[in-house]
Amino acid sequence: MNQPRFKIKELKPINVQDGFLVDGFPSAGFASAIASESLIHTTGFEVAAIIDSDTFPPVSLIKDGIPNYPTRIFVQNELNVAIFSSYLTLHESLHKQMARFMLSWAKKHGIKYIITSIGVRAPNQTEQIVAAGSTEEARKKILEAGIHVLQHGTIPGIPGSLLNQGMLSGQNVIAVLFNSMEQGPDFKSSAQLCMAISKLVPGASCDISTLNKEAQIAEKIIKETDNEAKNLKEGMYQ
């Protein structure tokens, strides 16, 4: 069986040596994607590359009349920060491959920290943010940001794969865990996550006042993209 091949086309110079890579793929409640959108809009990021694969649905997102790939890399070279931003919810069979792809890209560009995130549904609805680190340096960074280090737990998906592979390779990976809602635009979780990322990434900021609007827009686009992908797959086998 052939492994999925992810392709990057860089559109402009990228200089994020010793900086940060933020994983913005949607997770539970869409908060990861929404928080990434807020960082992009608030902190002056620009599209620097597109990511494509034959395993991705053939979907174009039209914004202000301009076609866009649903998965892109945004960069703020002055802050040394890159964001993998996506409106695609990847099937779990692609999670390990995407994690390896991110780690390879991070190594190529000299990234010091990869920041990923995932929503958890805490029984007591706690608002406390916790994080796990792949290395001692990553765990120290978490504590310096005033965030509790997760001591015991299970982290699935792309974040879990990034942690495991980062532990083996020595790449600093920080996985932020936040309390997630089951349904609806996840404004509260997005705000919590965005503030946590801004503590970890110097110079990054969030516009909390616009998060609610961005949450609704991002959720709508992600759901539409998922529906289009589902319809395409169903049409292939009729």
Listing of model-derived features with the role each one plays in the protein:
Residues 49, 82-84, 113-115, 172-177:
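Hydrophobic/aromatic beta-strand patches that form the interior of the parallel beta-sheet core
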Residues 1-87:
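N-terminal short beta-loop-beta anion/metal-coordinating cradle
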Residues 184-238:
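A conserved C-terminal secondary-structure "cap"
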Residues 25-30, 90-92, 119-124, 156, ...:
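Gly/Ser/Thr-rich loops at beta-strand to alpha-helix junctions
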Residues 37-41, 99-101, 191-194:
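Short, solvent-exposed amphipathic alpha-helical segments in soluble enzyme
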Residues 46, 103-114, 167-172, 200-204:
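Secondary-structure boundary elements
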